[in-house]
Design a protein with these regions (language model features):
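Solvent-exposed interaction patches of small proteins and small membrane subunits
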Residues: 1-133
Length: 133
């Protein structure tokens, strides 16, 4: 790996870790509509940082993939960066939903998913990245 690529991965991984920490700050609060909106926004950012971190890691390992979440997630699964693709596919779906419209019942659903599944998947990715670097 070139020094530039290593630096780009390390920087992207740092962004992911920081965004995950900020997401957890929001999750620690009692949920109100304001906190729910914060959770969703921080989820959006963390998801973006997560798949971009996986992309940087995989490219640095020689994978040739497009820089798009729907291309990165299957390769990350095949490379065992993530143990399951299903939660990541759901995260991608929710991320797309939050970008295009606001629906209160959907926001409650997404927030619950972030609490129950997404943060666990993010934690597992972080642990795997720390283990591999």
């Amino acid at each position: 790996m070139s020094a530039e690529r290593v630096d780009r991965f390390e920087l992207q991984f740092e962004y992911f870790q920081k965004s995950l920490a900020r997401l957890k700050e929001a999750l620690a609060e009692d949920e109100t509509s304001f906190v729910r909106d914060s959770i969703i926004k921080r989820f959006e950012v963390t998801f973006e940082m997560a798949w971009k971190t996986m992309f940087r890691f995989l490219v640095d390992k020689g994978e040739r993939i497009a820089p798009k979440a729907w291309d990165v997630i299957p390769v990350a699964f095949q490379s065992l960066l993530i143990p399951e693709a299903a939660p990541w596919d759901k995260m991608r779906e929710y991320r797309n939903d939050t970008s295009h419209e606001y629906n209160e019942s959907r926001a409650v659903e997404i927030s619950a998913f972030v609490r129950s599944d997404a943060v666990f998947a993010f934690d597992r990715l972080q642990a795997e990245m720390l283990n591999r670097t």
